[in-house]
């Protein structure tokens, strides 16, 4: 992980981001934890370091709204959706695979009413969605555009390298770890 200090210096000096590519979410978190030494202030770290994941890792607010609108006939399902809605309102990142998501919730309410509410089938309608400005996945994308260090998995990094983003925002510096 000795590459993190020079990468962060390069990003600051060049006002550009460095994408760090890893194989697993565990490695993503390990790198983010290591960066807490470079950026001990949590507020500064939140601006400079972003973990990017695919949309299938974030709660889709439209899917949650639709599930709540179809309120299931089973009281247990209604309680499950209530717990998800409560977590969503308190979550800063909506990451269903991250440390802030209570693992016991999946065991309690099942996959369909927890991680099943993510965008798993590519159904995201992006800016046409009423929740676009609050969307957890979009927040992650916007934060990555401003960050010095973006930590992502190999698949997402390769997609970014190939297609980039709006206004020619394709990253130009990459580090592949494992």
Language-model segments: which ranges?
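Glycine-rich, N-terminal phosphate-binding loop of Rossmann-like dinucleotide-binding domains
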Residues: 22, 154, 178
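Post-Walker A helix-loop "phosphate-sensing" segment adjacent to the P-loop in P-loop NTPases
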Residues: 10-16
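Walker A/P-loop
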Residues: 1-6
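Conserved helix/coil segment N-terminal to the catalytic DExD/H
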Residues: 138-145, 155-170
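SF2 helicase catalytic motif II
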Residues: 169-178
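A substrate-engagement module of RecA-like helicase motors
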Residues: 16-18, 22-148
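Hydrophobic/aromatic-lined pockets within catalytic cores
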Residues: 12, 36, 161-162
């Amino acid at each position: 992980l000795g590459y993190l200090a020079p990468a962060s210096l390069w990003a600051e000096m060049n006002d550009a981001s460095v994408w760090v590519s890893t194989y697993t979410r565990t490695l993503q978190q390990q790198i983010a934890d290591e960066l807490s030494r470079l950026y001990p202030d949590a507020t500064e770290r939140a601006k400079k370091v972003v973990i990017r994941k695919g949309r299938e890792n974030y709660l889709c607010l439209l899917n949650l709204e639709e599930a709540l609108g179809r309120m299931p006939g089973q009281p247990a399902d209604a309680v499950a959706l209530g717990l998800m809605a409560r977590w969503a309102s308190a979550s800063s990142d909506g990451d269903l695979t991250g440390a802030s998501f209570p693992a016991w919730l999946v065991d309690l309410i099942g996959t369909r009413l927890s991680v099943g509410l993510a965008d798993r089938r590519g159904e995201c309608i992006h800016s046409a969605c009423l929740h676009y400005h609050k969307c957890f996945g979009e927040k992650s994308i916007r934060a990555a555009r401003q960050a010095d260090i973006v930590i992502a998995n190999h698949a997402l990094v390769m997609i970014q390298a190939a297609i980039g983003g709006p206004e020619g925002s394709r990253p130009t510096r990459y580090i592949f770890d494992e």
